[in-house]
Amino acid sequence: MTDSFKRYLFIYRYSSYTKYIFGYLQIQLRVILSVGIWTFSQTNLQAAQLNENTKSSPLNTTQYDLELSKPLPYGFLIAAPENFNPDLRVPPPLPKPPENSNPPKTSTEPAKPSAVLESINTDYRYDTDNFGQTNLFIEPTLQFRLRNGNKIFVKTGYDFFEQRGVESVSNFPLQVGWEGKIGQVTLKTAAGVDVFDRLPTAINLNAKVDVPILPARVSPSGQLRSLLVVSGNLEQGPYKSNARTLENQITSWRFGPDLYWQIDRNTSLFSSLRLGNYNDGNSEVQTFSRLERKLGQFSLAANLFTWSYDRDLERTSGYFSPPDFLVYNAEVAWEGDIAKFLRCRLAANLGRQRLKGEFDNANTYQTRCTVKLSPNIEADLGYSFSNVRNQDTGESAYGGNSLTGQLRVKF
């Protein structure tokens, strides 16, 4: 070993090429050290970036979701801004660990489920009139939220239809739906079956598309100032008007647009058009418009409803099919808090209705209360009486009663 060292020392002193070789080795050593230092710094930087990317975002998600204190009429859905999908994020590549490093410890935290139960809403409706017709609807809907922000709905329940001169009909609906976003457009679709106790099973489906024309503007207090949304609707299934209509196995296709315009924070306009085709060869055109102005806890509204069928088939098919039906009225309403856990609304509609060229009074009286049972549970209970016709009663006066409710449970 000593002889070898002396030999290398001798070469260093006397060889003419030794200076160049040693200089080359010095340069190579500097390059290796520089690359090593740079690689080490980049590894720490990538690790810091990776740690930063894996942290949850501090943004409040309520900035992206608009929730109104009062739902829009007829279950109208407001398009919310696009949901952020964390699954689409691509993290930076992991640096290669040193050969002598220990393997990373696996996380003991359970993986997040692909779907989480978000809420259960149970709708209740009991309709009766002075001609012996009864319709009952009890339909719970389970809502699941997926990891990408989309929603899945499962709807089932029990419906019952009773009418004079007709055997009663029981219905067990089952429907599965999906709601998601494509850009700023909200799409909702559903399909299912209606199972009856003594009638053939029928298929049902519906679809809805919400397109925001003017984006929502919200005040610092959270009140909606302006918004314009246009919707497209498509529905198909059994026409659940009464027991006789179901016994005749009447089905319909209905489609048409909706428009909701929040003109300012106290004024809104809702308008709807429906075109319908029935399997008995009949067709319909239905329109509804409502202009509402809020005055503190009070509100004033004007309603206009038209309904016309190509043919009057009530005697053969069983459903109300007027060739020319018109209803217009004015509404006065009050809504406010009775207690911290109780909020109620009272409304009266006074107007006129026209059927087959004959005019008559058209009045409706409504009340609804919302009870907050807990932070995650609340219930609605409402009652209404109306003499707006739902069937052709000739010279006899018509009177209909509706008891409605909804139980909402959030998880």
Predicted stretch roles:
Residues 37-45:
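C-terminal segment of classical bacterial N-terminal signal peptides
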Residues 16, 21, 45-46, 77:
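N-terminal cationic amphipathic segment used for targeting or macromolecule association
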Residues 3, 7-8, 30, 36, ...:
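N-terminal leader/targeting segments
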Residues 48-331, 335-373, 380-410:
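Transmembrane beta-barrel domains of bacterial outer-membrane proteins
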Residues 1, 29, 230-234:
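Generic low-polarity alpha-helical segments
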Residues 1-23:
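N-terminal secretory signal peptides that target proteins for export/translocation
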Residues 2-5, 45-51:
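N-terminal acidic, proline/glycine-rich, low-complexity intrinsically disordered segments
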Residues 20-35:
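Sec-dependent N-terminal signal peptides
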